[in-house]
């Protein structure tokens, strides 16, 4: 079993299930590669509700089915007051942390020892964990 941990951002999860999105094929391929190579895939508990909200705008019943699939392939990371406070502290101390949700995801990825954050948000800031879009990940994987 590969012990490498990858944090999967909510936009990647939405991209997997919404075929109309521009990064759909890259997101599906990236997750397939990661699963085939036995990476541990993680996401945060708050992203599950965000993903459901976005997908339910298209089809509520399918959105629930999609979430069931997500919880079967990704480890869902809970968080509490300490993680929220750490995210706020980072935002107050580093102007590069501009988005509370992204900063919280970074805090969780760091806490869990993730080596990579997979996000299709090109402005996702992480000072010490590599961030790749799914397209970048697929391109890099194919060159290895």
UniProtKB/Swiss-Prot annotation:
Which cofactors does this protein require? Mg(2+)
Lineage of source species = Bacteria, Pseudomonadati, Aquificota, Aquificia, Aquificales
Similarity comment text for this entry: Belongs to the PINc/VapC protein family.
Where would I find the PINc domain in this sequence? 6-132
**What keyword terms does UniProt attach to this protein?**
Hydrolase, Magnesium, Metal-binding, Nuclease, Plasmid, Toxin-antitoxin system
As for what it does, the entry says: Toxic component of a type II toxin-antitoxin (TA) system. An RNase.
According to its UniProt record, what is one Pfam family this protein matches? PIN
Q: Which organism is it from?
A: Aquifex aeolicus (strain VF5)
Q: Name one GO molecular function term.
A: magnesium ion binding
Question: What protein name is recorded for this chain?
Answer: Ribonuclease VapC1
Keyword Hydrolase set for record? yes
Q: What class of enzyme is it?
A: hydrolase
Q: EC number(s) on record?
A: 3.1.-.-
Q: Where does Mg(2+) bind?
A: 9, 102
């Amino acid at each position: 079993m590969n012990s490498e941990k990858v944090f999967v951002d909510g936009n990647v999860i939405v991209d997997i299930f919404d075929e109309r999105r521009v990064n759909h094929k890259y997101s599906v391929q990236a997750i397939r590669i990661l699963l085939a190579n036995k990476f541990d895939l993680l996401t945060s508990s708050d992203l599950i509700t965000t993903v459901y909200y976005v997908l339910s705008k298209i089809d509520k019943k399918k959105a629930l089915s999609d979430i069931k699939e997500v919880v079967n392939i990704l480890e869902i990371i809970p968080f509490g007051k300490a993680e929220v406070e750490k995210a706020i502290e980072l935002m107050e101390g580093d102007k590069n942390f501009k988005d509370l949700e992204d900063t919280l995801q970074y805090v969780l990825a760091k806490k869990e020892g993730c080596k990579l954050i997979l996000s299709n948000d090109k402005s996702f800031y992480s000072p010490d964990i590599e961030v790749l879009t799914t397209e970048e990940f697929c391109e890099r994987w194919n060159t290895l």
